[in-house]
């Protein structure tokens, strides 16, 4: 039994591209710029006073073989989306709402720019508040899961 893997895009790049390509600047009040969205390894130092930041990074991955003999390999990758702003809690909440809206739209298949990859699904898992109130640095970290299915032959 050999496993044949499809050519999958990097899951972190897939999620950050989904956010970047579907971001609507008009949805965040008080700003006319997109936040600095990207993979953790692609972003250099960013001054939060100038721009909001959204970083994506992988935290876990699993493979589950479904079925006996020839079956499916279900690949699941957990991606963290780290949203940070210096403006305040209301802006942080706006960033979070826009990210959730984009992911829900991608899952429903009605986002303007869908996943465009071999990944079958993306879904939201959990959210953590990692704000540092003494530094006035407002953060949410949202975990999402991206899933692929590959044939085992």
Descriptions of predicted regions:
Residues 1-69, 106, 110-116:
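Small/polar-rich, solvent-exposed N-terminal microdomains that initiate assembly or binding
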């Amino acid at each position: 039994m050999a496993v044949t893997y499809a050519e999958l895009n990097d899951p972190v790049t897939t999620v950050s591209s989904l956010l970047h390509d579907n971001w609507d600047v008009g949805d965040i009040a008080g700003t006319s710029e997109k936040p600095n969205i990207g993979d953790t390894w692609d972003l250099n130092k960013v001054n939060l006073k100038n721009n909001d930041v959204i970083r994506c990074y992988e935290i876990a991955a699993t493979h589950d073989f479904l079925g006996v003999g020839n079956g499916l390999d279900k690949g699941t990758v957990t991606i963290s989306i780290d949203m940070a702003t210096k403006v305040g809690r209301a802006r942080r909440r706006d960033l979070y709402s826009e990210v959730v809206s984009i992911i829900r739209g991608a899952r429903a298949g009605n986002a303007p720019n869908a996943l465009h990859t071999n990944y079958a699904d993306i879904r939201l898992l959990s959210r953590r508040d990692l704000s540092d109130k003494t530094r006035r640095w407002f953060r949410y970290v949202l975990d999402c899961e991206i899933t692929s299915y590959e044939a085992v032959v």
